[in-house]
Amino acid sequence: MIFQNVCRNESNFNAIASESRSQTQFGVSKSSSSGGGCISARTKDRHTKVNGRSRRVTMPALAAARIFQLTRELGHKTEGETIEWLLSQAEPSIIAATGYGTKLISNWVDVAADDSSSSSSMTSPQTQTQTPQSPSCRLDLCQPIGIQYPVNGYSHMPFTAMLLEPMTTTAESEVEIAEEEERRRRHH
């Protein structure tokens, strides 16, 4: 529901404002003008915009569900933190495919955020001279056939295999972990 300078009388304003509170990402304010109360929409994006674009990322439902699951499993506070982690793990593959990595892009976002807060013009991104840390695991897009990965052994699992892994509840995963540990004890 979008409101754009829709004038209403005082009794309708309260009904519309209470209805909009349950669905909003925008604020509703009443201004005094001739003809009664007037509702104006103020959209406010709570997130940092990258390079002035107000766009959202769309992704397949399976990928989004996997990001939510990884956020819980890795103990991250936000899905954005999980996506940053995934990008850092994929850095060598990104550099191989594009010729540059995400470090330069994240530095550009920092510069854009600083510039937007000071209202100055955008400057070119600064290059980062710090050497990147070697990743703890590599991004392997080809899943080897016939290899079974342990339930919580995500550090050595290819990314595509992680996406295809079904979501489990905490109780199910605890049972699976116990079963996996029991199998390891029998084999060793």
Curated annotation (Swiss-Prot):
Keywords: DNA-binding, Nucleus, Transcription, Transcription regulation. Residues 44-53 have a biased composition (Basic residues). Residues 26-53, 115-136 are annotated as: Disordered. Transmembrane segments: none annotated. GO terms for cellular component: nucleus. One of its GO terms (molecular function) is DNA-binding transcription factor activity. Residues 116-136 have a biased composition (Low complexity). Its main location: nucleus. This is Transcription factor TCP11. The gene is TCP11.
